[in-house]
């Protein structure tokens, strides 16, 4: 089939790039809240995110040549450049989030079948949130997760993850609360 008319269809014609961009926006908002806890403010990454997210959101979708000549090099270059703005915004936001999480004690990689994980609420309201992390392993058939403070055993769900096993559960958090959970492989 023919290529989409990016000019005419706009945001709906590029769902993957838009999803990537919206994830960058979400990560940036999380980082704004995490900064309240860490006091760390990386102006360079904030500026990189801001510049690129603005360029992505403002830049038009395509060129009038997409209607008559969609395979033209200029059309392809404009499309690639526009998508790169979303990607660079996402990269800056992800780097900023990794920096914030590291300051809060996260190791960012989990290879052990038993250990501890910290979850941080970025909400100013008491709420129940999903907590998810993955363990890089070939198999993990069962796991026990316990809230270190209350000793409550959490109801967990295990699912496949591209790099191992994803562990998911729900936990109630006070505003901006940090919680530590212990996870242990079960036979």
Region annotations inferred by a language model:
Residues 120, 168-172:
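Beta-strand-rich interaction surfaces with strong enrichment in secreted/lumenal proteins
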Residues 173-184:
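Short Pro-Gly-centered flexible turn/kink motifs
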Residues 120-141:
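Surface-exposed beta-strand/loop patches in extracellular or lumenal glycoproteins
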Residues 122-126, 182-187:
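Beta-strand-rich N-terminal accessory domains
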Residues 141-167:
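Solvent-exposed beta-strand/loop surfaces of large extracellular or lumenal domains
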Residues 111-116, 127:
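Short, solvent-exposed loop/turn segments enriched in Ser/Thr/Gly
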Residues 1-107, 116, 148-152, 179:
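Catalytic-domain carbohydrate-binding cleft regions of carbohydrate-active enzymes
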């Amino acid at each position: 089939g023919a290529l989409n008319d990016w000019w005419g269809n706009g945001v709906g014609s590029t769902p993957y790039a838009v999803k990537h961009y919206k994830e960058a926006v979400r990560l940036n908002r999380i980082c704004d809240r995490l900064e309240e806890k860490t006091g760390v403010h990386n102006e360079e990454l904030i500026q990189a995110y801001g510049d690129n997210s603005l360029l992505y959101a403002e830049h038009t979708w395509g060129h009038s040549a997409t209607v008559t000549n969609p395979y033209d090099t200029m059309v392809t270059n404009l499309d690639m450049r526009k998508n790169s703005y979303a990607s660079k915004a996402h990269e800056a936001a992800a780097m900023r989030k990794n920096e914030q999480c590291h300051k809060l004690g996260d190791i960012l990689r989990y290879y052990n079948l038993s250990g501890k994980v910290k979850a941080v609420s970025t909400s100013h309201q008491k709420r129940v949130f999903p907590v998810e992390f993955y363990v890089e392993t070939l198999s993990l058939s069962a796991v026990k997760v316990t809230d270190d403070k209350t000793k409550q055993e959490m109801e967990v769900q295990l699912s496949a993850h591209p790099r191992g096993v994803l562990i998911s559960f729900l936990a109630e958090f006070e505003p901006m609360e940090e919680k530590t959970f212990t996870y242990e492989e079960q036979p």
